[in-house]
């Protein structure tokens, strides 16, 4: 007959053998939750992994049972982001992105001359869909430009709607007697407006003054306006210093103030000089004197080196300074060689 003590001892051994060890809290998986979540589990208890919204399950199984060994089986659970479909091609624009995965955001931008019609960004949602549809890039247009006062449109080619596209230009002209301040050309900008309009202002100039030893002709009218012209001239033996024709400019001044400069009488009777790169006889080429602004080069001797060099002389309003190194060759001293005939240094 089996004793009661032996029976109790056997039952304790059996319980220890079948109870096993408890399992610890399972590994944390990014973007996943465990149900039920406890600090330890008895052998035979089950857990299940669930992915958070926006993520999908990858692995062999999502359910695990705590074994008698107290060690969880190898866990291959992964929760990966949902991937939204290709966003599409934005015509006349660009889609900027790093990835199409949840919860990333993509942005939209239009090329210069187009504006965004729709949202500037879209987010990949938990369902793997984009939060908004692909926008549209619409071409920028400008309304008909305003015409400045006292101006006319000289160049303008609008659309059939009378609007203009980005980059289109309009060119203005001022009415007679009016000068333009600012750029005569305006451009339709990427913002749908025109660049700054110019301004047309009436401009008057004083009557031009007559130069000494000369004359000036201009239109016979009471007032001289912008773009009116005057013509200058000089008396005999005087040379005009400045343009022959001047114009009333936009600032109410004449474009130049010409003057009449006197010719130069030459004290040298005989010399060979350089004029515009050619050797000429001074007494023949300039028998009536040199005009203001004319320049010649006189030949001089370098006695030490026995060679010649040139120095310039210019007629300036009736005055010319003959180089000091120049020595006029006398016809009586026929045995002497003129500096112009000596080899150059």
From Swiss-Prot:
Keywords: Disulfide bond, Glycoprotein, Heparin-binding, Repeat, Secreted, Signal, Sushi
Secretion signal span: 1-19
GO terms of molecular function: heparin binding; identical protein binding; lipoprotein lipase activator activity; phospholipid binding
InterPro entries according to UniProt: Compl-Cell_Adhes-Reg (IPR050350), Sushi/SCR/CCP_sf (IPR035976), Sushi_2 (IPR015104), Sushi_SCR_CCP_dom (IPR000436)
Free-text tissue specificity from the UniProt record: Expressed by the liver and secreted in plasma.
Region (Sushi-like) residue spans: 263-345
Entry's Gene Ontology BP terms: blood coagulation, intrinsic pathway; negative regulation of angiogenesis; negative regulation of blood coagulation; negative regulation of endothelial cell migration; negative regulation of endothelial cell proliferation; negative regulation of fibrinolysis; negative regulation of myeloid cell apoptotic process; negative regulation of smooth muscle cell apoptotic process
GO CC, alphabetical: cell surface; chylomicron; high-density lipoprotein particle; very-low-density lipoprotein particle
tRNA-binding found in the keyword field: no
Stated role: Binds to various kinds of negatively charged substances such as heparin, phospholipids, and dextran sulfate. May prevent activation of the intrinsic blood coagulation cascade by binding to phospholipids on the surface of damaged cells.
Protein name: Beta-2-glycoprotein 1
Species name: Canis lupus familiaris (Dog)
Gene transcribed to yield this protein: APOH
